[in-house]
Regions:
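Non-transmembrane, aqueous-exposed alpha-helical and coiled segments at domain scale
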Residues: 1-310, 408
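Feature captures the catalytic cores and cofactor-binding loops of soluble hydro-lyases/lyases
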Residues: 209, 213-249, 344-475
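C-terminal binding/interaction regions
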Residues: 249-257, 264-265, 278, 300, ...
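Short, structured beta-strand/loop micro-motifs enriched in basic residues and often containing a Trp
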Residues: 312-322
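Residue "hotspots" at secondary-structure boundaries inside conserved domains
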Residues: 325-328, 367
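Short, charged beta-turn/beta-strand-edge "cap" motif at the junction between a beta-strand
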Residues: 335, 341-345
Length: 510
């Protein structure tokens, strides 16, 4: 009988969550490096470079890779011969206590993103609890833990289908994935759960994302099972879609496809697909009664020495003097360096502004959006001499429902976020001669270094969703939708899907 100390378990959860906040799994970094060297689309290559540079900076500075430090998901396999030294806390409560300590760590506070009463008040719980815990009793005398912090951008793109037994899973994935947009921050991974029931398939898909990146080894070895054959087929065909890094078009959309399957009813084919983003964060550890998990940090020399050059065609913009006429010359796809003051705002702030305008109250005191830019972001709290913590973009698509209101009623000139905008929003941007700029998702610590001043100007009660004023210097962004409605998230993938088909045809002709 192995005795596991409650305190060792809690401490291990805390240490693991701190660890994954600033360390990518090395297998994922190696896969990204391969994708970087392989990439032919310069925009996608630049995006991967920023992700890799950000990853090394986070590893060095012990600060979060992404401002969205995620919802904690924990798989706990407890051996039947394990005994706990105390029984006053359940496993759920122990995981929550470790989560609480990790997210409130004063040296590296992580962003609290969990809201209670999700269908009602949606009030932040302040410590990122509760976590999501899956518990399994297994043979043995130790405890095995797989833990991840999953950001909302990728989690929100989860897709579920109850297919007919004769339906093609490949066809469903290839039809579904392009409709998911770029809010899941590719390049990443796909976890696919097949079989069981609907909820079992979802758990299988999530658990698959905890597995190591090994598609290249599988390609070299060759498929031996139906699941392995499906992995290889999907890996090849998904990347031929040309979605690319950040949805800009390119050769690599996924670095691996993971599949877990179990038997199912003869009448059913449940399938769930969950993407993991470029800020993939997970860790696997064991407890055997000898103490807390021994989590060894990776070596910094394991990170690639990638550089990112802006080039000579970059456009420098002063946000404090910009006029509507200025943005008319900006073209979709070009790189812009922003300097000056911008405001921030995301879901809760937009909803509150909409309610105020609908009541005829006007904007909150201190907020003037006329000819200004708004950055969709919820930053991590600052520590030590930081102006602000990691502050990467959130998914812009969620603000689509508010865009016409913001452009027509506030005089807003531009927006900054990640991922694509919907067709109606693009039309609204075109109508108002506004612009939408894209920052790289998964490069939050890198982006934060461009922010020189920060202050809360409205809705302080919303915490990370408050409206801030940032003063930035040379913040890198890409024109994603210009004032004429040209849209890189439509153009890029279409071009690169055709380019990949052409390259494929040439290879087959040889």
């Amino acid at each position: 009988m192995t005795v596991i100390r409650q305190q060792d378990f809690i401490e291990s959860i805390e240490d693991a969550l701190q660890y994954i906040s600033y360390y990518h799994p090395l297998d994922f970094i190696q896969a990204l490096e391969q994708a970087y060297h392989k990439e032919q689309n310069q925009a996608a290559k630049d995006a991967i470079a920023q992700i890799l540079i950000n990853s090394r900076m986070s590893a060095e500075g012990h600060r979060p890779i992404c401002q969205d430090t995620g919802i904690v998901t924990c798989f706990v396999k407890i051996g039947m011969d394990v005994k706990w030294d105390k029984t006053d806390l359940t496993v759920q409560q122990m995981v929550d206590e470790g989560t609480r300590r990790a997210y409130l760590n004063p040296d590296n506070p992580l962003r609290a993103s969990i809201v209670a009463d999700p269908a009602g008040a949606r009030k932040n719980t302040k410590d990122n609890t509760p976590s999501v815990v899956h518990i399994d009793l297994v043979a043995g005398h130790h405890v095995e833990v797989m833990i991840a912090a999953k950001g909302g951008g990728s989690e929100n793109k989860t897709k579920m289908a109850m297919l007919n037994p004769s339906d093609s899973i490949v066809d469903w994935v290839l039809e579904t994935l392009p409709k998911m947009g770029a809010g899941w921050c590719p390049p990443g991974m796909l976890g696919i759960g097949i079989g069981g029931t609907a909820e079992k398939a979802a758990v299988l898909a999530k658990e698959a994302l905890m597995e190591p990146v090994d598609i290249q080894e599988l390609i070299a070895k060759g498929a031996e099972t139906a699941d392995e054959k499906l992995r290889l087929e999907l890996y090849e065909k998904v990347n031929k879609l040309g979605i690319g890094a950040q949805g800009l078009g390119g050769l690599t959309t996924v670095v691996d496809v993971k599949i877990n399957s179990v038997p199912t009813h003869a009448a059913s084919l449940p399938v769930v697909m969950i993407p993991n983003c470029a800020a993939t964060r997970h860790l696997h550890f064991h407890l055997d009664g000898s103490g807390p998990a021994d989590i060894k940090p990776p070596k910094l020399e394991d990170w690639p020495q990638v550089t990112w050059e802006l080039g000579s065609k970059v456009r420098r913009v002063n946000l404090d003097t910009i006029t509507p006429a200025d943005v008319q010359s900006w073209q979709a796809g070009e790189t812009v360096l922003l300097s000056g003051k911008m405001l921030t705002g995301r879901d809760a702030a937009h909803k509150r502004i909409a309610d105020m305008l609908n009541k005829g109250e006007g904007l909150p005191e201190g907020v003037d959006l006329k000819n200004r830019f708004i950055y969709y972001v919820g930053p991590v709290d600052a520590v030590r001499d930081e102006v602000v913590g990691p502050a990467g973009p959130t998914t812009a698509t969620r603000m689509d429902k508010f865009t016409e209101m913001m452009l027509s009623q506030t005089g807003l000139l531009g927006m900054i976020g990640k991922s694509e905008r919907g067709d109606l929003t693009v039309e609204s941007i075109k109508k108002h001669k506004a612009v939408y700029l894209m920052a790289v998702g998964g490069a939050a610590y890198l982006v934060s270094k461009a922010i020189k001043k920060s202050r809360v100007v409205a809705f302080a009660d919303l915490g990370m969703e408050a409206i801030y004023e940032f003063e930035v210097e040379d913040m890198p962004v890409t024109v994603a939708v210009d004032s004429n409605g040209n849209n890189v998230h439509k153009q890029g993938p279409a071009i690169w899907k055709a380019n990949i088909a052409e390259l494929d045809a040439k290879l087959k002709a040889k």
